[in-house]
């Protein structure tokens, strides 16, 4: 009678263990065993973090083991169990069966060995059937839903507990936005102000009552220098929204600025048109905000939005500084162009309006749409179309970890009607929805390809723009990811023909196009992939968006937005329509009140924190891959990332404003906050 040694590993997260009965069946090429109860006398099996071994003897020859079936039956109360993996020592072999899934209720799970396989590799009927049944079950669990008209489709779940257990957070309490924001305000000692809506601050210094002063930090430097043009310009390159600035190839007609108006800012003694031709003029246009409805959820507080155009100049020191700001799109007598030569407070308020507009576009488009929602689309499509044995599933699963869950919590508490977003933001109350609906029309595949996106904005020259660290570090990380994905692709796809014939892969790509991009041809998202090179690029887009891009635009929020005048989430008076009338009192009365300031501060603090036990780029503790060539590729990937960490650390030495958001040791694997 054949005898097997079965090793069972239970997860180490909270509540991973179980007291339920666990049964195991072995399915081989020659037959299926009876189910065996895995139990040791006087021993507490399947405790959290435990690795337990059992001897299993079967009555007949099973042939080569193909599958392992695990069944969980209730002992007292239903007790979910997180199974990491099973190993099987047979008379002639040693087989690993990765799982990394929850078994809930009176459930069962059927596992394949850990070798990654394309559909063409499965010749045995039982394996083909297992593959098909897994996808059929997943497609019933992971359903598309339209949360708002025009949005990329999201998961069909009203709240976190409705999600499949495998993609829920280990502890929902840890990602409760209401709890976390309130806790953040308590930790920042600002909760005494959190209900003081309609109560204005007295002056700029008064904002220090809610500012946590930590020496030698970016946030402190922002507080001390936020009014300076150099600091204003620097943020377009290396702040938390470094994706909008582009080289100005032609002055737009809607911004009728002349050489005479900006002459005192031009250091090369050239006309404005000549500076444009020389490539020294840059522009940031917030046209997306034009006509967006401002927040009206609080009848006691009027809130306002602008749609500014900001012209910037590269001076002789190669630094970017603002030279002209128009606060709305249509030129006219009541929409003056503000200049550095204007009265101090005229110019300052114009810059504050730009910073406020930048905050809105950052939160809703750069952050929410282009990382969170896009990554969720990739995640849902992956679960629907790629079985766990598929190499692309094994590659991507770490990079969609908790993404669907965090987005579901956001729809439940944060960006829903009367959610937390409405409390402090001028684009709350529906404006943020309008913004996404507009921006989706311009979302393209090439905008997610980092090198292409940088080049399209004319920002690719390191000689012309030497202080664009977001670009420099992003390209290093992109190249490291692309090198890694190319290696993995070459292991499983020997030529382009294999890529084209992988129907599961093609269905995954098609799902993203049809449901994520809503079948919009102008998006440029591929409907299919026809080469190994294009597959590697596509996988790099998925991983880079979920990891590096999200890190770049998320984890600097407290640094750059905690000083309220530098990133006001709302404005309580409309943009100035004339020059020479702005006073310091008017600026303070325009900035957010005490209550909204506190909710904003709690939000940017909470969103900027890493998760407990965060997994950073290159960390793959769940061993979905067992093959040596892939593990060697992972090792090379980690070494490349470590080299990038060292390059960035060396550059940042002695810098007053270090840029570290794209250092791989600070880039989480996935969008999970």
From Swiss-Prot:
Q: How is it modified after translation?
A: Serine phosphorylation by MAPKAPK2 is stimulated by arachidonic acid. Phosphorylation on Ser-523 by PKA has an inhibitory effect. Phosphorylation on Ser-271 prevents export from the nucleus. Phosphorylation at Ser-523 is stimulated by 8-bromo-3',5'-cyclic AMP or prostaglandin E2.
Q: Where in the cell is it found?
A: Cytoplasm; Nucleus matrix; Nucleus membrane; Cytoplasm, Perinuclear region
Question: What's the protein's topology in the membrane?
Answer: Peripheral membrane protein
Give the record's GO biological process terms. Answer: dendritic cell migration; glucose homeostasis; humoral immune response; leukocyte chemotaxis involved in inflammatory response; leukocyte migration involved in inflammatory response; leukotriene A4 biosynthetic process; leukotriene biosynthetic process; lipid oxidation
Q: Which gene encodes it?
A: ALOX5
Q: What positions does the entry give for Ca(2+) 1 binding?
A: 17, 79-80
Note on how the cofactor is bound: Binds 1 Fe cation per subunit.
Alphabetical list of InterPro entries matching this protein: LipOase, LipOase_C, LipOase_C_sf, LipOase_CS, LipOase_Fe_BS, LipOase_mml, PLAT/LH2_dom, PLAT/LH2_dom_sf
Instruction: Look up the record and name the cofactor or cofactors this protein needs.
Output: Fe cation
Provide the Lipoxygenase domain boundaries: 118-673
- The source's domain of life comes to Eukaryota
Q: What is the name of this protein?
A: Polyunsaturated fatty acid 5-lipoxygenase
Similarity comment text for this entry: Belongs to the lipoxygenase family.
Q: What does this protein do?
A: Catalyzes the oxygenation of arachidonate to 5-hydroperoxyeicosatetraenoate (5-HPETE) followed by the dehydration to 5,6- epoxyeicosatetraenoate (Leukotriene A4/LTA4), the first two steps in the biosynthesis of leukotrienes, which are potent mediators of inflammation. Also catalyzes the oxygenation of arachidonate into 8-hydroperoxyicosatetraenoate (8-HPETE) and 12-hydroperoxyicosatetraenoate (12-HPETE). Displays lipoxin synthase activity being able to convert (15S)-HETE into a conjugate tetraene.
One molecular function GO term is:
arachidonate 5-lipoxygenase activity
Q: What CDD domains has UniProt attached to this entry?
A: PLAT_LOX (cd01753)
Question: Per the record's keyword annotation, is Metal-binding included, yes or no?
Answer: yes
């Amino acid at each position: 009678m054949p005898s097997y040694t079965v090793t069972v590993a239970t997860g180490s997260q909270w509540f991973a263990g179980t007291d339920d009965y666990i049964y195991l069946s072995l399915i081989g090429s020659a037959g299926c065993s009876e189910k065996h109860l895995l139990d040791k006398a006087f021993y507490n099996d399947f405790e959290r973090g435990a690795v337990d071994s059992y001897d299993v003897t079967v009555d007949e020859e099973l042939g080569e083991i193909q599958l392992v079936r695990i069944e969980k039956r209730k002992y007292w109360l239903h007790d979910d169990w997180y199974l990491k993996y099973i190993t099987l020592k047979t008379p002639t072999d040693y087989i690993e069966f990765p799982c990394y899934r929850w078994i809930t209720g009176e459930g069962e799970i059927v596992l394949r060995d850990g070798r990654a396989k394309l559909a063409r590799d499965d010749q045995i009927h039982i394996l083909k059937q297992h593959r098909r049944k897994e996808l059929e079950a997943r497609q019933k669990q992971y359903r598309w839903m339209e949360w708002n008209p025009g949005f990329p489709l999201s998961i069909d779940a009203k709240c976190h507990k409705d999600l499949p257990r495998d993609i829920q957070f280990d502890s929902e309490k840890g990602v409760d936005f209401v709890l976390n924001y309130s806790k953040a305000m308590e930790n920042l000692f600002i909760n005494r102000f959190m209900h003081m809506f309609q109560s204005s601050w007295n002056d700029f210094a008064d904002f220090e009552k809610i500012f946590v002063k930590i020496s030698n930090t970016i946030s402190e430097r922002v507080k001390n220098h936020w009014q300076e043009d150099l600091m204003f310009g620097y943020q377009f390159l290396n702040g938390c929204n470094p994706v909008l600035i582009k080289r100005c190839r032609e002055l737009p007609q809607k911004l009728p600025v002349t050489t005479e108006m900006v002459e005192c800012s031009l250091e090369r003694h050239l006309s404005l048109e000549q500076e444009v031709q020389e490539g020294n003029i840059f522009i940031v246009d917030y046209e997306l905000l034009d006509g967006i409805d401002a927040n009206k959820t609080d009848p006691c507080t009027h809130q306002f939005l602008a749609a500014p155009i900001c012209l910037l100049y590269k001076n002789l020191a190669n630094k970017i500084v603002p030279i002209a700001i128009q606060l709305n799109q249509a030129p006219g007598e009541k929409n003056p162009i503000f200049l550095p030569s204007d009265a101090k407070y005229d110019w300052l308020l114009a810059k504050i309006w730009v910073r406020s507009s930048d905050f809105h576009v950052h939160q809703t488009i750069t952050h929410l749409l282009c990382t969170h929602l896009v990554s969720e689309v990739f995640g849902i499509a992956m679960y629907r179309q790629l079985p766990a044995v598929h190499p692309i599933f094994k590659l991507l699963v770490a990079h969609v970890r908790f993404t669907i869950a965090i987005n579901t919590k956001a729809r439940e508490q944060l960006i829903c009607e009367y959610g937390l977003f409405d409390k402090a933001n001028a684009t709350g109350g529906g404006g943020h929805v309008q913004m996404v609906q507009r921006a989706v029309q311009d979302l393209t595949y090439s905008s997610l390809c980092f090198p292409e996106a940088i080049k399209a904005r004319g920002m690719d020259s390191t000689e012309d723009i030497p202080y664009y660290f977001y670009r420099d570090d992003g390209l290093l990380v992109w190249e490291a990811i692309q090198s890694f994905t190319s290696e993995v692709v070459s292991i499983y796809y020997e030529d382009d023909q294999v890529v084209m014939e992988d129907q599961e892969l093609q269905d995954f790509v098609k799902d993203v196009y049809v449901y994520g991009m809503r079948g919009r041809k102008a998006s440029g998202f591929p409907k299919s992939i026809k080469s190994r090179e294009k597959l590697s690029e596509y996988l790099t887009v998925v991983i880079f968006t979920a990891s590096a891009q999200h890190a770049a635009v998320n984890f600097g929020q407290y640094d750059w937005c905690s000083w309220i005048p530098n990133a006001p989430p709302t404005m309580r008076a409309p943009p100035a329509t004339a020059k020479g009338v702005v006073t310091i009192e008017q600026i303070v009365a325009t900035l957010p009140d005490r209550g909204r300031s506190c909710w904003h501060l709690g939000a940017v603090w909470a969103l900027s924190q890493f998760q407990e036990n965060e997994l950073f780029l290159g960390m793959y503790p769940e061993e979905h891959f067992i093959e040596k060539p892939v593990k060697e590729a992972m090792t090379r990937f980690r070494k490349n990332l470590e080299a990038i960490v060292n390059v960035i650390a060396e550059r940042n030495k002695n810098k007053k404003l270090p840029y570290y958001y794209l250092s791989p040791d600070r880039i989480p694997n996935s969008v999970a906050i």
